[in-house]
């Protein structure tokens, strides 16, 4: 009874907070720098950990078991032997890399029965955050020196300052990070990588220290029918029944230090790992995520939001839809293509659908209008003070003018990039070929390594059809100003037969294979760097080399696209970018100053953040959405929608799902197996794989998605609608035990 009373009180407190100025769910907070008011809210909701238990620099706090998974996802260490949980879609690229038609672990799943069977993943790494240093004074001092040197004592105009800030800030931050890494190496610290980043619109700069582990091995994955259950149909939707998890292990050298892959490496022995709870939760239970959210734009101006929706997202949605139709057809008819294109299709379609949801939500919720009202409030605030007027009065007119000035070029740029460099892979290969010779030798090897990997997952038949479809589509979407020269050849020589033109390109180009690409780019390099009889001869060699490379039709096509872009797109984008960035930062600073009495968090930038909230259902447009899904809903989807490939399931797995053999993982109230659940946590891309903790810091799930009704949350958080979707840890462990027969792994996780 006392437990029930406490839960009821916590839920009531949460609802009161949701109605107040400080919402219980909004915020991506920097651990170690979290506002006291925010922490008070977290504790009122059920957080039982001290600040020191959340964040410390000795390796034993909760933040130390949370990892940056490959610089694109999050993950959590769950055992004393470095076992790691993340999402299936985060491990998808690694799983696909290890799959072949003969050993299709993507389709069939994989269980390592012994440590020796765990499979190393080339190029995969994880980073464990160590600490952060405030470098604000150092960055500002460096910027002031640059401003002084550039102006020679004259007054620095705002436009010039914006250009200099944009031009030099990145270099300053990189230099600070590089110096810190070098010092760490000199001090004998292995695997330390540093990143310096801006926060609060440039009011704060932090240097983050990470320990990077480059020997990460696949241990367990379910078949993609479970790990991607629902596919594109259910992506960003609720209710969900996706077993979105995969299991890896971190390895280190014999001394426990980061090391590249070696057979003799041993499992990492972390100082801290997450304990798991299978006790479950209720409506209103405390839930906390810790992870690496990639990017949000909560302080973005109304002009910036309008650009995101109507200029940036529209080309992505339109072109990717065409591309993915071609890819899907090939992937379904040829399993080898299905494996090769699995990861890049998933990445493409994820943001394609997200952009559609964002545009729909921004319109439905009136986000731009809400932001315009906020901007009126800001105008009234700075107009009331002379000093504030001087700083901020030109901010909004400048943003309006600058966004308008780049509108057409930005829109066209979206179609160029999505069509030629993200759509037609051979054109991107051609672009890299044309710049290869001018590259530094060290960078050349990086390009070669990238190309070798890219061609492993490439099928020229698919790309040829994609080229034909996208070339025709591009001509229909942009004005004549943005049409490259080769379109006249398509019209005159091929009679606008795009398939014939594409077939000719692919028949004549050397870039359809890695061997062809490498042979083309290296054919003349050796002779051009030999000691020449004269300087003129050396120059002639380089010229001949470039002519040879550019004679390839795919390279020539890429070059003409770049020439068109440089002629009519690059200038307006380059001219306006510094001004927009500077004034958007200024807007952020204005908001923080105007609301200095309120807790504020910085926009996400792939640094470790904590979000706190509660397990919660929601209602939208009269439809109620429960906070939990259970096994019957999964079985119902499979049986009702068997004609949809996204809901396909192997007969033997369906039999297991129907077995009702849930054991200790069954929900204590319903007796059913919990699958996925909703919370009010504030997440975004990059948070995928983030551990979801209860108030005691015990793992109850893995965050993997947001909900369609609030896909505008990267721009504006709606506490009534925005929900985080997580996979219940009981579903995870049940599948490991019952499908995978991996008792050894379950026991490791449970500490037995």
Regions from the language model: what does each represent?
Residues 1-10:
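Bacterial N-terminal signal peptides that target proteins for export
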Residues 2, 20-752:
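Terminal presequence/propeptide segments associated with secretion/organelle targeting
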Residues 10-19:
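Bacterial N-terminal signal peptides
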